[in-house]
């Protein structure tokens, strides 16, 4: 497959996504697969909106129709549309509400201003403190000392 074909497909995909309020954040083609596989990651142009499964499904139809209607590809292909996914880092209030009970790693400064890390299950964040459950005990970390909070796997 020529570089020109890949470039034309990428441009067509980006144009189709833009027409429906999305940006393409990643575009990959796997030409060694049969049929050819095209993977496209998208995000909303409006940063306050999250990409839903319905968004991916609808955009997949539009992009598929655009490719089929063009003369760029003359072979079968699979098209996969997905989002960038969520960040591992919790920053917004809604993140802390959504992931209550999930395992997190907290980086913070102790009383001597030395960076520390601890793990536990997220309980809540208030205006004053972050609370995590560590083996049944609540650890309270002042919000002003928290450097970052990151989702982890249960094993850490």
UniProtKB/Swiss-Prot annotation:
Task: Fetch the SUPFAM superfamilies from UniProt.
Answer: YhbC-like, C-terminal domain, YhbC-like, N-terminal domain
Where does the protein end up?
Cytoplasm
Give the record's GO CC terms: cytosol
- Principal subcellular localization: cytoplasm
Keywords, A to Z, come to: Cytoplasm, Ribosome biogenesis
The UniProt entry's GO biological process terms, in alphabetical order, are:
ribosomal small subunit assembly; translation
Pfam families tied to this protein: RimP_N (PF02576)
Q: Which family does it belong to?
A: Belongs to the RimP family.
Q: What does this protein do?
A: Required for maturation of 30S ribosomal subunits.
| Listed name of the protein | Ribosome maturation factor RimP
Species name for this entry? Prochlorococcus marinus (strain NATL1A)
The top of its lineage is: Bacteria, Bacillati, Cyanobacteriota, Cyanophyceae, Synechococcales
């Amino acid at each position: 497959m020529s570089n020109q074909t890949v470039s034309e497909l990428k441009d067509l995909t980006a144009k189709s996504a833009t027409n429906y309020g999305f940006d393409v954040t990643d575009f990959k083609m796997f030409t060694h697969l049969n049929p050819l596989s095209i993977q496209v990651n998208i995000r909303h142009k409006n940063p306050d909106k999250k990409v839903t499964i319905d968004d991916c499904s609808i955009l997949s139809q539009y992009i598929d129709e655009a490719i089929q209607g063009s003369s760029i590809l003359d072979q079968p292909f699979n098209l996969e549309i997905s989002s960038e996914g969520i960040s591992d880092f919790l920053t917004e209030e809604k993140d802390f509400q959504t992931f209550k009970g999930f395992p997190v790693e907290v980086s913070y400064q102790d009383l001597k201003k030395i960076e520390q890390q601890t793990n536990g299950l997220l309980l809540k964040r208030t205006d004053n403190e972050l609370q995590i459950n560590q083996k049944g005990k609540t650890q309270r970390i002042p919000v002003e000392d928290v450097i970052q909070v990151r989702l982890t796997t249960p094993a850490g």
